[in-house]
């Protein structure tokens, strides 16, 4: 009877070890995925910053052209 108890205990311990091993592998996979996603977020943030700067530059250029157009229209009205 004692031997059967030890066999059952051994099976349960082995199952626990297998479960722990699988969970450790899953944790490693999730860590890798997290690192990949973190890099993607950083790249996206950098891309966003570049787009914001480009947008500001384009707005400034638009204002310059609008001012030039207004000046040209003003000269045309004088004629």
From Swiss-Prot:
Residues 6-78 form a coiled coil. Gene3D superfamilies: 1.20.5.340. It comes from the Bacteria. GO terms for biological process: division septum assembly; FtsZ-dependent cytokinesis. It is found in: Cytoplasm. GO terms for cellular component: cytoplasm. InterPro entries: Cell_div_ZapB. The keyword Cell cycle applies. Pfam families: ZapB. Keywords: Cell cycle, Cell division, Coiled coil, Cytoplasm, Septation. Non-essential, abundant cell division factor that is required for proper Z-ring formation. It is recruited early to the divisome by direct interaction with FtsZ, stimulating Z-ring assembly and thereby promoting cell division earlier in the cell cycle. Its recruitment to the Z-ring requires functional FtsA or ZipA. NCBIfam families: PRK15422.1. Homodimer. The ends of the coiled-coil dimer bind to each other, forming polymers. Interacts with FtsZ. Belongs to the ZapB family. This is Cell division protein ZapB. It comes from Yersinia enterocolitica serotype O:8 / biotype 1B (strain NCTC 13174 / 8081).
């Amino acid at each position: 009877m004692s031997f059967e108890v030890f066999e059952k205990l051994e099976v349960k311990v082995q199952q626990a070890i297998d479960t722990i091993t699988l969970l450790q592998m899953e944790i490693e996979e999730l860590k890798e995925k997290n690192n990949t996603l973190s890099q993607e977020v950083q790249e996206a943030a950098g891309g966003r910053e570049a787009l914001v700067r480009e947008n500001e530059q384009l707005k400034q250029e638009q204002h310059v052209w609008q001012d030039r157009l207004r000046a040209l229209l003003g000269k045309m009205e004088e004629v």
